[in-house]
């Protein structure tokens, strides 16, 4: 039931409306102008408006400040990225700029690998700056690979969920997936409410490699053992001897990402109040 300023049911008037849709195709009009109710998350957090590059710029700043506090290189918790706009994969428009940006990022990653003695071959992941759902994703190890994209790849990159056309992409430093669950490559996904880590799961895919996108058909999921982690520091032993508690580390990065998201949404809020 929609009134002038509220949305509810026949016998229920909520103070808060919880949204569980990413709104890639846009927000329905029935949710607009609800100034007396909270929308969680707000409308400008939908993926028709939100951009990955904006989030990662905010996360980069948070990681730098956190790294300075601890005296660590922020790169250890913040993979490098860049953004390219003005693309049209169907017509090969902007591919030269994408190739140049990809080559530049791979060069930066190689320098970091040399600094830390990492012998793996670097790669980047190119994905739409808008949208979600693991669509329109491409792994590149050499910028020359972008010279001759086949029609299938162009079509995959040109349009994503809900028919959205891709004109802007984010190029992210690829990070090899080291985790395994039942011999399948696995990556952690952490759930948060407010500033609290409340759980998570491993997304795993037996048919994908350590440098591939796991968010694809055939993926399966198992809960993360946050509460009953067996990898806790042992009492009385020297620091660094106990096996690392990976689950705690996941939670730290998740909380940093949540802080970055709060900065992001505050900066992009169309109804933000301005104080003189």
PLM region descriptions:
Residues 21-23, 128-131:
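Short, flexible beta-strand-to-coil junctions
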Residues 1-120:
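Conserved N-proximal alpha/beta basic substrate-recognition cap immediately N-terminal to
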């Amino acid at each position: 039931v929609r009134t002038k300023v509220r949305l509810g049911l026949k016998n229920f008037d909520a103070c808060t409306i919880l949204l569980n849709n990413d709104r890639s195709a846009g927000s329905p009009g029935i949710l607009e102008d609800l100034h007396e109710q909270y929308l969680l998350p707000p409308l400008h957090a939908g993926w028709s408006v939100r951009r990955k590059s904006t989030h990662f710029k905010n996360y980069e700043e948070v990681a730098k400040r956190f790294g300075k506090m601890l005296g660590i290189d922020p790169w250890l918790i913040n993979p490098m990225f860049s953004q390219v706009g003005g693309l049209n994969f169907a017509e090969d428009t902007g591919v030269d700029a994408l190739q140049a940006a990809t080559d530049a990022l791979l060069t930066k990653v190689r320098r970091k690998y040399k600094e830390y003695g990492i012998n793996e071959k670097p790669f980047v992941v190119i994905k739409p700056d808008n949208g979600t759902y693991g669509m329109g994703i491409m792994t590149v190890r050499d910028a020359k690979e972008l010279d001759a994209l086949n029609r299938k790849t162009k079509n995959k990159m040109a349009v994503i969920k809900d028919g959205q056309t891709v004109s802007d992409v984010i190029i992210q430093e690829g990070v090899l997936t080291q985790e395994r669950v039942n011999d399948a490559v696995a990556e952690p996904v952490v759930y948060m409410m407010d500033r609290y880590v409340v759980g998570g799961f491993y997304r795993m895919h037996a048919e994908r490699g350590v440098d591939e996108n796991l968010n694809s058909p055939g993926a399966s999921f198992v809960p993360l053992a946050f509460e009953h982690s067996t990898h806790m520091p042992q009492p009385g032993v020297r620091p660094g001897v106990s096996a690392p508690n990976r689950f705690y580390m996941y939670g730290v990065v998740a909380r940093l990402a949540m802080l970055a998201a709060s900065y992001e949404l505050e900066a992009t809020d169309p109804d933000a109040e301005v104080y003189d």
